[in-house]
Amino acid sequence: SPPLAFTFGLGGLVLFPMSVGASIVLLEQAAPPALLEAIPAYGVTTLITAPTSYRVMAETARKMHLSVAQGGTLRQCVSAGEVLPAATRALWKDATGIEIIDGIGATEMLHIFISHPDDDARPGATGKVVPGYRACVMDDAGRPLPPGVVGKLAVKGPTGCRYLEDARQAQYVKDGWNYTGDAYLIDADGYFHYQARTDDMIVSAGYNIGAPEVEEAL
């Protein structure tokens, strides 16, 4: 369902399917009801949409028996575009038996650079660095932070960009690192955990607290 103008849509609905000779189902109106109808109608095996859609579709999907294990065709479900709450991941898996594959990319990077296979999902984590890319969490001075400390996500890889005229983006690339504008922490096993946008952080008693963390607690 992502627009083709987004990196998520360009990769998920054009480049990746074409690279393996897969057929693509493009819907003019890709709202959750239309997505659910399209899966059995076209024998869809991989569903690509945002976390909000998975949450909205879960209860109806439970009755439709869409997954291969339930007698349907659906084998994989991919999510990006916004943070994937652990509750949404669990809700969809309970309804379909399928673990959502999460990931984060950026239009400037033209690729998802942190993700995980479906058998290596960790609730609350986006995943690990995709082969070919490097990622770390930096402090305000551009120094790598240790595991468990929230900082700015910085990425290097075979794709990237530079801004030429927009003064607001003059700090996007520093020392070859692309700063995505996301606040993350890395756990001891190398999994990246999204916290918030870097302009959406709450600082309390010297700690950086992500707004989504507060929302989940409430």
What are these regions (language model features)?
Residues 4-46, 60:
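Conserved AMP-binding/adenylation subdomain of ANL enzymes
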Residues 19-22, 41-49, 58-122, 134:
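Gly/Ser/Thr-rich phosphate-binding loop
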Residues 31, 52-54, 84:
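Alpha-helix capping/helix-boundary segments
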Residues 47, 154-157, 162, 169, ...:
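AMP-binding/adenylate-forming catalytic core of the ANL superfamily
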Residues 81, 105, 127, 142, ...:
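Active-site glycine-centered loops adjacent to acidic/histidine catalytic or metal-binding residues
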Residues 128-132, 143-175, 207-209:
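Conserved ATP/PPi-binding loop(s) of AMP-dependent carboxylate-activating enzymes
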Residues 138-139, 180, 186:
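Hydrophobic alpha-helical segments, especially N-terminal targeting/anchoring helices
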